[in-house]
């Protein structure tokens, strides 16, 4: 079944190197992903949709705001977008720091294309599942709020048994 653009998800790529950005776009669009490119962390934070089903492929070292700073901004906004860091000059302590703060992976350039595609697909699938569960919780809450006090009492009795 073909997924709609809203449920298929988007891959955000934040990378200052145009050649790397373009090669990632080509690689992922060839696999039918919807891709949005940003050359800086500031541009990404100004334009991304925090409610989208998405994965963020984020360069660590960029002029202006670093990838680490972008991650901090997303944490402060309570945005749980999966982040895959990419870096040409990463070190172990940097990788550990990003992972402890919730990044999904830390990949060194040049990276294995098949492994990156597989990781992105896994993260988008998990994001779709999280969104579906959140929507179901909202629907359940809306239905529960419509119960009369008597119906709420009966439900509480049933659940407690």
What are these regions (language model features)?
Residues 39-40, 66-69:
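Acidic catalytic/metal-coordinating carboxylates
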Residues 51-58:
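Active-site beta3 strand of CheY-like receiver
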